[in-house]
Regions:
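Positively charged n-region of N-terminal signal peptides that target proteins for export
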Residues: 2-8
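Bacterial N-terminal signal peptides
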Residues: 11-20
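Mature N-terminal segment immediately following signal peptide/propeptide cleavage
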Residues: 24-54, 325
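A flexible loop/linker signature enriched in serine peptidases of the S9 family
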Residues: 25-26, 44-50, 58, 63-69, ...
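Conserved beta-strand position repeated across blades of beta-propeller domains
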Residues: 33, 73, 117, 170, ...
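Residue-level detector of Asp-centered blade-edge/turn motifs that repeat once per structural unit
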Residues: 36-37, 76-77, 120-121, 173-174, ...
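Glycine-rich phosphate/pyrophosphate-binding loop
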Residues: 315, 320-326
Length: 349
């Protein structure tokens, strides 16, 4: 009751033990992408962009803002990295030198923008955002269904490429064709073992003719297309054979001839990429792996040194409790504030 809350003061301490520079083996690295030459891997960790040698070692922190940075994308020459940052309130596309330095903001729309790929000539960055549906391809719900745009790497006016969702873009070397995963309806991208009419498929889009072609038609999820350096084989992530996400591949000439590349049993494989020398790179169970041809996956041993600030905050609550209950003997009261369970004596002692 209101009286009950007036008499009980709850003090919450939020945060973690204050640490001054520490080294740790990180877990739950996300948005993983290997560099074109296969020597480095960019990834997101705790809201910052890092890169690490593909053979493992100490990671280099590239962004240091208080904001959240994610989705690093290498330029074709490996000299720049595009990424998303919400440092101005919503996610915009930025680009920075791959060795670190000042980042340039490329997009300013009030919606969120997520970079997907550079064009092969390195002149444009493709990104997804829910900005403006064309009349002929408006989708519901509008805020969840994006369109595909491009922006010059040097900055300038954005241009709509497709009026329908197209994510995880992968170009062929000519730049005339790109592969993408579709989005037919809204579904949490982290949901596992999802089968329905709106599961993602992999498509090609011919920029010269405007033709879309579906390459995968199975009932589950197919996503994250990656074209091999020879331009003949497409790698992708899929939930097939009753299992979780693994890496699969098929020859472009025979999309129905799908073969498994990895055979992880427990957790999904995420964030697939490939270097120009054919090295696969992906995330599994929070860590990063590389894989050459038909050889076994190799875990990348990574060390991250951070100087995290104190994140302790003291909060005083006199209202807002939910799910209150009284013990059977009437002497104690249990309640929840901010997702935490507290117990106090009924006489407020």
């Amino acid at each position: 009751s209101h009286t009950f809350m007036k008499k009980i003061f709850v003090y919450l301490t939020l945060g973690f033990t204050t640490l001054t520079s520490y080294a740790a083996t990180p877990l739950w690295m996300r948005d993983i992408q290997i560099s074109p030459d296969g020597t480095e891997i960019a990834f997101c960790y705790k809201g910052d962009i890092y890169k690490v040698p593909a053979k493992g070692g100490a990671a280099t922190q590239l962004t240091t803002q208080d904001s959240y940075e994610s989705n690093p994308i290498w330029s074709p020459d490996g000299r720049q990295i595009a990424f998303a940052s919400d440092r101005y309130g919503n996610f915009d596309v930025f680009v920075m030198p791959a060795n670190g330095g000042a980042a340039q903001r490329l997009t300013t729309n009030s919606t969120g923008e997520t970079p997907s790929a550079f064009t092969p000539d390195g002149k444009y960055i493709l990104f997804s955002a829910a900005i403006q549906d064309p009349v002929e391809s408006a989708l519901f719900p509008r805020s969840a269904m994006t369109e595909l745009y491009k922006v010059p790497v040097t900055g300038g006016r954005t241009e709509q490429v497709l009026g329908t969702p197209a994510e995880a873009i992968c170009f062929d070397k000519s730049g005339n064709l790109f592969f993408y995963q579709d989005q037919k309806g809204f579904e949490d991208q982290w949901r596992k073992h999802h089968t329905s009419s709106i599961t993602r498929d992999i498509w090609t889009y011919d920029t010269r003719t405007g033709k879309h072609s579906n390459l995968t038609r199975h009932a589950g999820e197919d996503r994250n297309p990656i074209l091999a350096p020879d331009g003949q084989t497409l790698y992708f992530l899929s939930e097939r054979n009753g299992g979780s996400f693994n890496v699969y591949a098929f020859p472009l000439a025979q999309p129905e001839s799908v073969k498994a590349v990895t055979d992880f049993k427990t957790h999904p494989v995420r964030f697939l990429s490939m270097s120009n020398n054919g090295t696969l790179c992906y995330g599994y169970d929070g860590e990063i792996y590389t894989q050459q041809g038909g050889s076994a996956p190799q875990k990348v041993q990574i060390e991250i040194t951070r100087d995290d600030p104190s994140q302790v905050e003291y909060l005083n609550y006199t209202n807002g409790a939910t799910s209150a209950t009284v013990s059977p003997d009437g002497k104690q009261i249990g309640f929840i504030i901010r997702g935490e369970v507290f117990v106090t004596s009924a006489d407020y002692a």
